[in-house]
Amino acid sequence: MKSNQTGFSAIEMMVVVAIIGILAMIAIPSQMGRIIKEQVVAAIPLADIAKEPIAASWKAAKTLPVDNKEAALPAAEKVVSNFVSALEVKDGVINITFGNKAHPKIAGKILSLRPAVIEESQVVPIAWVCGNAKAPNQMTIKGENKTNVPDEYLPQLCR
């Protein structure tokens, strides 16, 4: 007697489900890193509100604002966004603290944007050095780097 079987048997279906489950377990963690990195990148433009007054202070008096108040910004905890719980200016450095809807792996972590200047020429615009990156040639970085976001979550420009 010949059997005309159509469709999947229960065992074949379980094998397919197991393979899909294994592929999902591999894919989800690799996507998590990308999502966290996107949150870091999304937070960086918030620093633009502090860059202008810092650059103006350097150009006018060759000094950098010591805090948010001197940079004419609200208190650090009042400058927030979806992934940022505070934006602090300290000696010209912009420190972004991650929080609010940020992934737990970066919540409470800091990304610093430090001004790089040419000491002898205030006219040359400030270059902003992100995170652990190095200064452009002939420029001096001002302030302390407080970046403690793991390198794997920093964009290439900040490593």
Model-based region annotation:
Residues 1-3, 59-60:
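Short alpha-helix boundary/capping motifs
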Residues 2, 25-28, 52, 122-124, ...:
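Generic detection of intrinsically disordered/low-complexity segments and helix-coil linkers/edges
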Residues 2-42, 46, 50:
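N-terminal single-pass transmembrane signal-anchor helix
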Residues 33-75:
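Conserved hydrophobic/amphipathic alpha-helical signal-anchor segments
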Residues 59-159:
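Periplasmic/extracellular, small/polar-rich flexible segments of pilin-like filament-forming proteins
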